[in-house]
Design a protein with these regions (language model features):
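Extracytoplasmic
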Residues: 54-89, 110, 195-199, 297, ...
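Helix-to-loop junctions at the C-terminal end of transmembrane segments
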Residues: 105-118, 337-351
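Helix-breaking motifs and short loop linkers at transmembrane-helix boundaries and internal kinks
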Residues: 69, 85-86, 109, 117-118, ...
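Conserved MFS/SLC helix-loop-helix module at the cytosolic interface between two early adjacent transmembrane helices
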Residues: 105-144
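Extracytoplasmic gate region of multi-pass secondary transporters
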Residues: 74-75, 277-343, 406, 410, ...
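Intracellular terminal tails of multi-pass secondary transporters
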Residues: 1-66, 79, 89, 233-268, ...
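Glycine-rich segments within core transmembrane alpha-helices of 12-TM secondary carriers
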Residues: 178-210, 219-225, 427-441
Length: 501
């Protein structure tokens, strides 16, 4: 074997184990077999490729379940759903609210359970449960039954998004994460966009077998989700230190390299033994609350679009119900472009704060376009068409911006938090505040304000001005901390750690 003296990795496990900065034991290796720098880089590239294909693919599909419910409910809202279930007044918003509350309550224990149970059985079980409950929604007869089913839906899906965010963050180095979160978001929004097309087709089955169109949406997509849940058991991968438990994934050498490269990046590949004290102590970190508030602000906007876009297009832009479902699709397909592009730039140049700020400004511009009154009276069809086109274009800009910021915020958080339980706790906490944003977002779109939707527009604009302020505050704080680190201060109990901004 040729010797490249740049970087060597030893692969024979020692009988001894080192203790990392968090107190957890980490496997060390002796000099029985060395890898040169070129061989190391080749293995790293191979591991990334395999992990992208196995983990990011299934994680993207499962993350789309976050939007599956909103896509079906949004599409159903312009069909006979309201009259069939007597969803009068604020009952539609309550159905969103109660779903979110159930999800918030169970997010922390469900995220911790990923470690207890293991990713494969855990995600397979909750995905199958989510699909089964979605299928059962097709047969509810009253709004009260709808509320009860949506509580169960919220519980079932509470562990999906924060759990997957946590799992993905354990497999990639900090500079690789934003693009991988972009893959997740791309799969999520592409599935939502495709779901609108599927919902359009299923709505055409209205009356078949005695079922309304919206019931067909829940029935078919619930069945598909159950199948995905079964497949997940074999497709999903375990944590890096347990990679050998995954079906047909990494070789023994690749598994060791996967562990070693994460350990070299941030020194927390193996978690401490679980204690609730080690989870709850992380709530003393003020960064957790800053990240949580930013997710809250972002989800105010995303909920308004995810659950209400067909209604906004129907009432605000005066299209038919089926046209509204179809026209809800293009903004989400478009969103794949900015999220992948900005995330590629973020990982390439190690940028986080500037991209979050840029995306927030784009969202503000999109909402102002959407809420813009006619510049001139629409006394001609040409003027009216231009105004509709301007407002519809605003939905593209806003959708692309908020989807891009999901990936950027995930990477921003994961890059600046060290420790397995701390990252699990932070992921669950921000997901809970994300859910609180859903509650707020479900009430800012008011049909009586059509076509301008002033409350939705100005709440979204204000939330993202505040987000920019928090990012600036974090950037200054991280800069000062990194300067102290250069002077010898150890950050987050990890030698060599520096904040990313």
């Amino acid at each position: 074997m040729s010797q490249d003296h740049g970087h060597q990795l030893t692969l024979e496990k020692s009988a001894s184990e080192a203790i990392n900065s968090n107190g957890a034991s980490t496997p060390q290796y002796n000099d029985e077999e060395d890898l040169s720098t070129s061989e190391w880089k080749h293995l790293e590239s191979k591991i990334r490729r395999k992990t992208d294909l196995r983990l990011c693919s299934i994680a993207g599909i499962l993350c789309s379940l976050n939007l599956l419910d909103s896509g079906i409910l949004a599409s159903a809202s312009v069909t006979s759903l309201f009259s069939d279930l007597d969803l009068q007044g604020q009952r539609y918003s309550v159905s969103i609210f109660i779903f979110t509350v159930a999800s918030i309550v169970f997010q922390l224990p469900c995220t911790v359970a990923v470690r207890w149970v293991g990713p494969r059985p855990w995600f397979a079980s909750i995905t199958f449960a989510f699909g089964l409950i979605t299928l059962c929604t097709a047969f509810v007869q009253t709004w009260r039954q709808m509320i009860a089913v949506r509580i169960l839906l919220g519980i079932a899906m509470s562990g999906i998004y924060p759990g997957l965010t946590y799992l993905v963050s354990t497999w990639y180095t900090r500079r690789e994460q934003q693009l991988r979160f972009a893959f997740l978001q791309s799969g999520e929004v592409a599935a939502l966009a495709t779901g609108y097309i599927v919902n359009y087709g299923l709505n055409l089955l209205d009356g078949r077998a005695g079922l309304e169109g919206w019931r067909w949406m829940y029935l078919v997509q619930g069945l598909i989700t159950c199948v995905i849940g079964i497949v997940t058991y074999w497709w999903m991968v375990d944590f890096p230190e347990n990679a050998q438990k995954s079906f047909f994934f990494l070789s023994e050498t690749e598994a060791k390299v996967a562990v070693q490269r994460i350990q070299a990046d941030r020194g927390d590949v193996v978690p401490d033994p679980f204690e609730w004290r080690k989870v709850l102590v992380n709530f003393k970190d003020p960064k957790l609350y800053g990240f949580a508030v930013m997710y809250f602000l972002l989800n105010i906007t995303s909920t308004a679009l995810n659950y209400f876009l067909p209604q906004i297009i129907e009432s605000g832009l005066e299209f038919s119900s089926n046209e509204s479902i179809l026209l809800s699709t293009p903004p989400y397909y478009y969103a794949v472009l900015p999220v992948v592009l900005t995330s590629f730039l973020g990982d390439t140049f190690n940028l986080r704060s500037p991209l979050i700020t840029f995306n927030a400004l784009c969202l503000i511009a999109g909402y102002l376009m959407f809420g813009a009154p006619p510049v001139v009276p629409s006394n001609t069809s040409n003027n009216g068409s231009r105004h509709v086109a301007l407002r519809y274009a605003g939905t593209f800009l806003a959708t692309g911006a908020y989807v891009s910021n999901w990936a950027a915020l995930n990477a921003y958080m994961a890059n600046n938090v060290v420790g397995q339980w701390k990252r699990a706790t932070t992921a669950a906490a921000v997901a809970a505040c994300n859910g609180l944003g859903s509650i707020a977002g479900s009430y800012i779109v008011r049909n009586q304000e059509a076509p301008g939707y002033a409350t939705a527009v100005w709440a979204s604009v204000g939330s993202h001005i505040l987000m920019i302020g928090i990012v600036i505050f974090f950037t200054i704080g991280f800069y000062v901390q990194n300067k102290n680190q250069k002077g010898g201060k150890v950050l987050q109990n990890t030698v060599g750690f520096r904040y990313t901004y």
